[in-house]
Amino acid sequence: MSPHFPALTPDQKKELADIAQRIVASGKGILAADESVGTMGKRLTQIGLENTDEHRRFYRQLLFTTDPSIKEHIGGIIFFHETMYQKTDGGVPFVKLVKDNGILVGIKVDKGVVPLAGTNGEGTTQGLDGLAERCAQYKKDGADFAKWRCVLKISPNTPSRLSIVENANVLARYATICQQNGLVPIVEPEILPDGDHDLKTCQYITEKVLAATYKALSDHHVYLEGTLLKPNMVTVGTAAPASTRPEQVAMATLTALRRTVPPAVPGITFLSGGQSEEDASIHLNAINKLHLIKPWALTFSYGRALQASVLKAWGGKKENLKAAQDELMRRAKINGQASKGEYKPTGTGAAAGESLFVANHAY
């Protein structure tokens, strides 16, 4: 068997590995601010704002101009396409603002979930057409890493083998295209929390999905040291009758990861999956407190679980800007502590304890 072509050069590999390690340096995680125009519209509507370019720009500016010390807890921020090319009130491009503060810039590159023919309502993710050209342009424009989300559902008949294999291969094709263009790929095979499944079922499905994903990454010659994984935590379904303790979620999650994710992967950045802000932090903390060998950084890539309280504090009013930024800093610090197993819950505000679950969530 001959080696694959074109192979990454040693310099390309070093750049990718360095980027991945910087993003998940000790105590740091990712702020996912890559909500689509439609999803941002839903967020803005909740606080009585119209979904306009300027409202979206102002909100992202609020996030990105939070005190520079946030870099102690945030290693990377994922942008949406329009955000890559927006500027502050003072004319500073958001990309420059973030990078000048030592935070790496990511970009969402998938084009959303579409139906997968031959399955019972399952999907695959589109966006491979033209991906190489887009990645090359994003790299020129300052991006360091990319994100691509695939979605799988748990039901009596899903995920099907077809869905698991198809989504694994799509993620692998995306990952190798990113690496050829100097971007670290975040590989995100999200198993939705919708349903009434128990913890064992979620763990079993998570293991099968991750095993297939890493088989595909190997088949496509992806350089694992220059990747990050963004998985779901292993939890019961949102409609499940029984609740679970954080220690149970932590053990099921870590067991699934230890069985499937190679130690070459530098970091695992969990998605919050509709958990409340506080639950997402408590579960991350519990995972990191487990006394088992953990060969990767275990940290966060949260969107809703970093921003829900921020949006409420802001309420669309400029006079609330500082209060909203203080809330972002607080949640970032909490999750930074949780990524080291050092978070001590002190009770939560009403917003932090609210479930952020959205059925069949789409970005």
Curated annotation (Swiss-Prot):
Recorded hits in Pfam families, A to Z, give: Glycolytic
What does it catalyze?
A: beta-D-fructose 1,6-bisphosphate = D-glyceraldehyde 3-phosphate + dihydroxyacetone phosphate
Q: Which residues does the annotation list for site: Necessary for preference for fructose 1,6-bisphosphate over fructose 1-phosphate?
A: 363
EC top class, as a word: lyase
- E.C. no: 4.1.2.13
| MF terms (GO), sorted A to Z | fructose-bisphosphate aldolase activity
What residues form the catalytic site here? 230 (schiff-base intermediate with dihydroxyacetone-p)
Q: Which family does it belong to?
A: Belongs to the class I fructose-bisphosphate aldolase family.
Q: What is this protein called?
A: Fructose-bisphosphate aldolase, muscle type
Q: Which organism is it from?
A: Lethenteron camtschaticum
Give the organism's phylogenetic lineage: Eukaryota, Metazoa, Chordata, Craniata, Vertebrata
